[in-house]
């Protein structure tokens, strides 16, 4: 039998975001915005062919190079209003994912380190690993979970 905890866990005073992830130490370069965009176009084409989304669900991806930038994202209530996305695309299987950016039912804004995005798009890691490890931050408008969007994201890679 287990005992009930009477005291709360003690929170650390500082949460380090400089953890050396495998993808961070494996990549000896910071991927350029143009390289990431080319990989995203290929990945979106691949994921769109497997899409099950029937409505306009949009993703916008924002990248940053400095791992400490995540602190600014955490401390801002609507960071998407202060940033320019690298790309915005539609998950709707009946639309052109790049050209048909209409009013959306849900719009998810993903904030991710450039190296992490490169690693997930090239198969070094997988989106599910990032979700568990809190590697990227998402702001949904409205804040509703849509399973077909998550499924789309799981196929978002070039391999």
Residue ranges and their predicted role:
Residues 1-159:
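Feature captures hydrophobic
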